[in-house]
């Protein structure tokens, strides 16, 4: 191993005039070495670097294109959603207005129905009162008639004696006989 190290050290001491070798002077060799390395890198790496940059550029452009398409789709969906929202808001407003109208209509219908029911109940009450009045009047008439009839019968019974009774019967028989002759 010592031989290998000695050979590298001996290479470092070679004279630089007219021969190829390593220059160990860092300040003198850096710009030259750097320019050689850069030249080799530029010459050989230019194609690779160009391909890498082109690939990267294509990926970025594809990403931007996809993003633009997604953005366009999102804007389109947003507009559709806004249109649906406006439509739903209009329908909700219509339902609200119709709901209030229907509530007012139902309220009026209920009031009218209640009024009609009260009117019918009032008519029924009046009919019932009239019926009860007629019934009471008829009962009073019947009682008055019965009392008058009983009074008349009582008066007739008290006034009639046998003689008057026989004369009344004879008069009635005579009237029937006369009526029979007229009809024959």
UniProtKB/Swiss-Prot annotation:
Subcellular location(s) per record: Plastid, Chloroplast thylakoid membrane
Transmembrane stretches, start-end: 27-49
InterPro entries: ATP_synth_b/b'su_bac/chlpt
Keywords on record: ATP synthesis, CF(0), Chloroplast, Hydrogen ion transport, Ion transport, Membrane, Plastid, Thylakoid, Transmembrane, Transmembrane helix, Transport
Entry keyword Ion transport: yes
One of the record's GO cellular component terms: chloroplast thylakoid membrane
Phosphoprotein found in the keyword field: no
Major subcellular site: plastid
Single Gene Ontology MF annotation: proton-transporting ATP synthase activity, rotational mechanism
Membrane topology: Single-pass membrane protein
Subunit and partners: F-type ATPases have 2 components, F(1) - the catalytic core - and F(0) - the membrane proton channel. F(1) has five subunits: alpha(3), beta(3), gamma(1), delta(1), epsilon(1). F(0) has four main subunits: a(1), b(1), b'(1) and c(10-14). The alpha and beta chains form an alternating ring which encloses part of the gamma chain. F(1) is attached to F(0) by a central stalk formed by the gamma and epsilon chains, while a peripheral stalk is formed by the delta, b and b' chains.
Family: Belongs to the ATPase B chain family.
Something else known: In plastids the F-type ATPase is also known as CF(1)CF(0).
Biological function: F(1)F(0) ATP synthase produces ATP from ADP in the presence of a proton or sodium gradient. F-type ATPases consist of two structural domains, F(1) containing the extramembraneous catalytic core and F(0) containing the membrane proton channel, linked together by a central stalk and a peripheral stalk. During catalysis, ATP synthesis in the catalytic domain of F(1) is coupled via a rotary mechanism of the central stalk subunits to proton translocation.
Protein name from the UniProt record: ATP synthase subunit b, chloroplastic
Organism (species): Eucalyptus globulus subsp. globulus
Organism taxonomic ancestry: Eukaryota, Viridiplantae, Streptophyta, Embryophyta, Tracheophyta
